[in-house]
């Protein structure tokens, strides 16, 4: 008896799934009956059509969401690759390469190198843009090269102001800064 009860339950489930299968073979617009529907004697049911539309809309949304996720992942991968390539180019410009493979240590070394370059530029610009505190007497009385009988600076006159100076002044702007890899006392 239990066996018959099980068969009856499964028979109803089979009929339900059979009707679902038949509707899945139905034409696109569902206005005419499929030959399989005619054979099994199934009639058109509006409830089934409404049921079919919802999964299609859901599956469309799911497919659209999946495509957008794939696109975002692809763009993120492309962005990461571009960043890695540009960091490698920057690292190639440095005189001593960092052998560490991680991005953070590479960027840290690049930043330290750029800071040291900026410090060197500051020191050099301060040395040539400010007037020296001490000027040797012979330099103040020097003639221009075109006025000299030799056609160039005389041997006693330096080419650059700080060349022959015994005292090089300490500039407060430069003296207060230290290279990035050194600490102040």
From Swiss-Prot:
Subcellular location: Nucleus
Cellular component aspect of the GO annotation: nucleus
Assigned keywords, A-Z: DNA-binding, Nucleus, Transcription, Transcription regulation
Superkingdom in the source lineage: Eukaryota
An annotated Gene Ontology molecular function: protein dimerization activity
One Pfam family linked to the record: HLH
GO biological process: regulation of DNA-templated transcription; somatic embryogenesis
CDD domains: bHLH_AtMEE8_like (cd19698)
Alphabetized SMART domains for the sequence: HLH
Domain bHLH: 67-117
UniProt xrefs under InterPro entries: bHLH_ALC-like_plant, bHLH_dom, HLH_DNA-bd_sf
Family designation: Belongs to the bHLH protein family.
Subunit structure: Homodimer.
Primary role: Transcription factor involved in somatic embryogenesis. Acts as a positive regulator of somatic embryo formation. Acts as a positive regulator of ECP63 by targeting its promoter and inducing its expression.
Protein name listed in UniProt: Transcription factor bHLH109
Organism: Arabidopsis thaliana
Top-level taxonomy: Eukaryota, Viridiplantae, Streptophyta, Embryophyta, Tracheophyta
Gene: BHLH109
